Regions:
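Conserved Rossmann-fold cofactor-binding substructure of NAD(P)-dependent oxidoreductases
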Residues: 51-63
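C-terminal catalytic/substrate-binding lobe primarily of soluble NAD(P)-dependent oxidoreductases
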Residues: 134-372
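Conserved N-terminal Rossmann-fold NAD(P)-binding element of oxidoreductases
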Residues: 3-7
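Rossmann-fold NAD(P)-binding glycine/threonine-rich loop
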Residues: 94-114
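ADP-ribose/adenylate-binding Rossmann-like module
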Residues: 82-100
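Helix N-cap at the beta1-alpha1 junction of Rossmann-like dinucleotide-binding domains, i.e.
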Residues: 32-34, 97
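N-terminal Rossmann-fold NAD(P) dinucleotide-binding loop
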Residues: 12-13
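Conserved acidic E/D residue at the C-terminus of a beta-strand in Rossmann-like folds
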Residues: 27-30
């Protein structure tokens, strides 16, 4: 079994390293630094290539049995489309803003199985929702999730576990919720509230546009929301930058040069938010599902708390996200899920065997979702 992993960032490297224990894996990236990290620590094959050149994919991917799409979000949709056009099965973790289900007909036509949003949230949150949706009548679904540094450094008290550009996109995109059966659009970062967690103390939750596919696949659930978790105070800093125009996309003239404020801000925040090797962090997620089963009220909660792995020097967000992606990839590899088309995880969770497989795959790697 030959697997191609497109993208060798923090999560992409974790995906390639884990899969290489059982399969012949090749990692593709245009950044030689990322590839060098893999070369030094694994036996993963590494090839430098510009993955925005989709015209080369047919030749590039012809010998591979499965593709993992781990490129940054801004190039994810077109990359997935190119992979599907090559007729290759794919697990996608690029978290692009476009609607992946728009590619369903193409995937069916090309006889491709494509599982998208294969991470933590979206990803595992969707899988869990899909599983319980098959067992009970759900009235409300709430997901709170965040990846944070253990060491709090002012002013932002934050390190980006993935591309800072994707974080800024998350902070600026309006949030879609479902309230009383209707989709409601709220400003990003709105409705902040403080919540206490056993492992980390008080965190602040904020609206973000994380429901994604379940807005369309779970329309029968009357109340659904997803919120991002940060240390208290972080949100007010971001809101101040936003209100002052630092995230504006229209060009302004500075000393005779036209620049976009968001580009300058991104460059500055990239350095501020860059996680250094060895920086300890954690991932936390809480899922609350309320409804009825056999006409009896039922509440279900899941809690994920995972920390940086000191032994393997693997960030928690890379572990929780990358291993989830690999669990879904193995569903395809082992033919446990072989339907053709584009499928977000909630459409896979309704199969109990698939649900158990993914949960056990993660548990075997020390990532455990505790149910109460």
């Amino acid at each position: 079994m030959k697997i191609a992993v497109l993208g060798a960032g923090m999560v992409g490297r974790t995906i390639a390293t884990d899969l290489s224990k059982d399969f012949d894996v090749t990692s593709f990236d245009r950044d030689e630094t990322n590839l060098d990290i893999l070369r030094k620590n694994t036996d993963v094959n590494c090839i430098k290539v510009d993955l925005s050149l989709h015209e080369c994919f047919k030749e590039l991917l012809k010998d591979f049995d499965l593709i993992v799409n781990a490129v940054p979000g801004f190039m994810g949709y077109k990359t997935l489309e190119a992979i599907i056009n090559c007729g290759k099965n794919v697990a996608d973790i690029s978290f692009f803003p476009e609607d992946a289900l728009a590619l369903h007909a193409l995937a069916v036509q090309k006889n491709v199985t494509a599982i998208v949003d294969c991470g933590v949230a979206p990803g595992m949150s969707n899988l869990i929702l899909g599983y319980h949706n098959s067992l009970m009548k759900i009235d409300s679904f709430e997901c709170m999730v965040g990846g944070l540094p253990k060491k709090r450094v002012k002013p932002f008290e934050y390190k980006a576990p993935f591309s800072p550009l994707d974080v800024i996109e998350e902070y600026t995109r309006p949030a879609r919720y479902v309230e009383n059966g209707f989709v409601v659009i709220k400003p990003a970062l709105s409705d902040a509230e403080f919540i206490n967690f056993e492992h980390v103390g008080t965190l602040e939750s904020l609206n973000t546009d994380g429901l994604r596919s379940i807005l369309f696949t779970m329309k029968h659930i009357p109340d659904m929301k997803e919120k991002t978790l940060r240390y208290p105070g972080h949100i007010s800093l971001i809101q101040a930058l936003m209100q002052a125009g630092f995230f504006n996309e229209e060009e302004i003239n500075v000393k005779g040069k036209n620049v976009r404020p968001i580009d300058v801000t991104s460059a500055i925040l990239f350095d501020q938010w860059k996680a250094e090797p060895g920086d300890e962090e954690f991932t936390i997620m809480k899922i609350i599902i309320k409804g009825t089963e056999n006409d009896v009220p039922k509440n279900v909660e899941y809690l994920l708390y995972d920390e940086y792995d000191i032994t393997t020097q693997t960030p928690s967000m890379s572990r929780t996200t990358g291993y989830a992606c690999n669990a879904f990839a193995n569903l395809i590899i082992n033919k446990k899920f072989d339907k053709k088309g584009v499928f977000p995880p909630e459409l896979i969770g309704n199969d109990e065997a698939c649900f158990r497989f993914v949960m056990n795959y993660l548990k075997d790697r020390g990532v455990e979702y505790k149910k109460s």
